[in-house]
Amino acid sequence: MSLKSLKLFSYTFIIGLMITTGVSMANSLPEHFTKTLDNGMQIVVIPMDNNSGVITTDIYYKVGSRNEVMGKSGMAHMLEHLSFKSTDKLEEGEFDTIVKSRGGVNNAATGFDKTHYYIKTASKNLGLSLDLFSELMHNLKLTDEEFQKERDVVAEERRLRTDNNPMGYLYFRVFNTHFTYHPYHWLPIGFMQDILSWKIEDIRDFYQRYYQPNNAILVVAGDITPEEVFKESEKYFGHIQNKHTIPKVTAVEPKVDGAKRAVLHKESNQVDTLAITYSIPNYEHDDQVVLSAISHILSSGKSSRFEKTLVNEKQLANQVYGYNMELADPGVFLIMAMCSPHASLDTLEKEILAELEKIKNGDVTQAELDKVKINTKAEFIYSLESSNSVAGLYGDYYVKGNIQPLLEYEEKLDKITLKDISDAAKKYFDHNFSTTVILKKN
């Protein structure tokens, strides 16, 4: 059986088992173990007991675009790029070379609330991975020459993914419009004006403040024991000292007091696009699980309401999706759509709102909700087979400060009722307090 066939069989088996036994299942999460070093660095280990000989080592820093200030946006993302340059022990590019020479893979990502770096490799390379991450934490050189070259790379990334991409540009601008005061006002890539005006001293200061042990969480998942990880973590990170007080984010977005609407025009744009956002609570709120179920009803798969009605039947959109963002601070439920070439943008917007009204009015069947529960649970359980997914799952919650929503997720999903769905839709999908951004084709 091929690997692809094996994965398909595994996923199909999970769904079949859930249908046979009923939607409700016990908590599927593997047990995890934690320890905090004397310098405040948190260690999280998730043994998977799968005899794979593979682990994912993922280091999270509690810093993202949320920790930036206006005029200095995008620095967390820029620092992520520079972290693979030279250190006291490594030449530029040597980090990647070492990982690949051991048959491993590595990558990094910056979000609103986090920056993280991971290495997936053989379990025997745990010490090597920790040694590399230790270098990144306290020995980056951050030379001006490396900075200037990488700034050009980041600026080009901004042009490619945001400025010259209709959906990317709309995504950036809807956050600019929805959030007026909170740092979620911009995306992790930052404003182009800021990218071009950074100084290397800005990046060095950002690094010194946020890349410290008491602002980091090390997550190791896979074929490994907690004892091994705790011992090696002490060896490679226990001696690193905290040198600066980490600034706290105090910004609170004012309560929305009305609807916002912006119509944008971009000379190079060749397609009408639309974004609608609604304010929702942060990741810890019980309603997040219900909002996630609503997002699946609206836009998960070919039988979802947006896909079936707006894309296939009425052919109003080439693509349309909606999802709840689980952020450290209150965030948004985001809907984005790309209009079909010969369709009316006004009609598309009205039809999107009509679909939301249906959910508010209780037009969701028990069979529809059960299908969402089964598929969501199956996807969740299937993701637990990968050390990458497991490390990312635990890391994403620990870095935001609370693992409890993850531990309670399956139980809360099982308990969702049709009334919960309609109540949440009524509570949050109030168009009198929404943000709508339209990007018109030229």
Feature names for model-found ranges:
Residues 1-6:
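N-terminal secretory signal peptides that target proteins for export/translocation
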Residues 10-21:
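Bacterial N-terminal signal peptides
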Residues 22-26:
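Sec/Tat signal peptide C-region and signal peptidase I cleavage site
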Residues 27, 180, 188, 213, ...:
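An aromatic/glycine/proline-enriched structural segment found at the starts
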Residues 28-60:
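Mature N-terminal segment immediately following signal peptide/propeptide cleavage
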Residues 51-68, 74-78, 92-137, 169-193, ...:
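M16 family metallopeptidases and their MPP-like homologs
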Residues 73-87:
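Active-site SXXK
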